[in-house]
Amino acid sequence: MEYDIMRWMQDNRKIFGFTLSIKEIERSAKKIWGHNLNFTAHNREFYNPIEKSSLRSYIQVGRDTYNYCSFSTDLQIVNLNFLRSPVYTKYFEYMDKAGGIFYERWSDSIIQSMAYSTMVPAKMIQHISPMGYQNKETVVCPADDIMWREYKCECDQGSDISFNRDLTCTQRYKDTQGMF
């Protein structure tokens, strides 16, 4: 990339940026949604102002079912002021006391994804599509050919998993945001 993504996010008032959106393993996230709903119900002051502009539908199916979508923390950019905020601190402490981090292996990506999706206006969350990512099992590569050439990417676009609905939730994010 030939521009400073952090500067761009700051200038565009983005709180959170991600490259990969994954589906969590159901057994390690079974009880977290109930705790999330309970926290939300007892802390309405944090949610009412942004509820209609949030990404709640990204992580929720129907009225109260979690779909196991989360933003991977493998490559993310986040404004630390949000993670240090009273609302997130209270939320994280509540989730920690619920015991799921220790007993059910709730990951930081699940907890943070629920927070971003319900506490941050959708327009402040950004899919960073020009940024690639690769590990043993995962390849995220810009799908746009022009962008791929312009940013001198070396990843294999054919191996990209970003829009595989069985593995990721990137398309769900785009659908929720009205991006096609």
Regions from the PLM with identified roles:
Residues 1-97, 105:
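Conserved catalytic core of nucleotide-sugar-dependent glycosyltransferases
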